[in-house]
Design a protein with these regions (language model features):
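Ser/Thr/Asn(+Pro)-rich, low-complexity disordered segments
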Residues: 1-167
Length: 167
């Protein structure tokens, strides 16, 4: 989620910037290759079978582990920053395979096995989709606006200090 505000590839290339790519690849491979889902993008979101909200995701990416389950479009939108071709293909697949796109944009979730859609909009998830699309279509405009702030300019370079990807 921070990628909608911070250009993590630029400011944290040896940590969060690379981790963003790894996370997107694992999301995709787990859903498509392990679970054999036709679409990917698991994260906490609304549940299709009730009015609730639950944690879904990729077990190895969660602190406590997640249960497999529904797919939510906001994950794919966030991946536009690091794997744009794959993200666009997944958004198209979601629209082609499921009734996931409504009058105000993407509904919150779909069960890729049953095809059941949570026909509701969650403002948090819609916000992530909106900002991710604004960045993708507007030359990273949200990230650039944030980075132009004098306070941000003082702290963003500190992200480069952390290196948790070296041997």
């Amino acid at each position: 989620m921070p990628t909608v505000i911070i250009d993590e590839k630029q400011y944290g290339p040896e940590n969060v910037g690379t981790n963003d790519v790894i996370h997107a690849v694992i999301q995709r491979r787990y859903a498509l290759d392990v679970l054999k889902y036709p679409v990917w993008g698991m994260s906490p979101c609304s549940m299709t079978a009730s009015n609730g909200y639950s944690e879904y995701g990729v077990k190895v990416l969660g602190v406590r582990g997640y249960k497999a389950g529904v797919v939510t479009p906001h994950v794919t939108a966030l991946a536009l920053y690091v794997t744009p071709a794959e993200a666009i293909a997944n958004l198209r697949n979601l629209i082609e395979k499921y009734d996931i796109y409504g009058q105000y944009g993407f509904y919150d979730a779909v069960d890729p096995v049953s095809g059941e859609v949570a026909h509701k909009y969650l403002v948090l998830d819609q916000g992530m989709i909106f900002l991710a699309l604004a960045n993708y279509l507007g030359d990273q405009c949200v990230q650039k606006h944030f980075a132009a702030d004098p306070i941000a300019q003082k702290v963003l370079p500190m992200l480069k200090d952390e290196n948790f990807l070296s041997n």
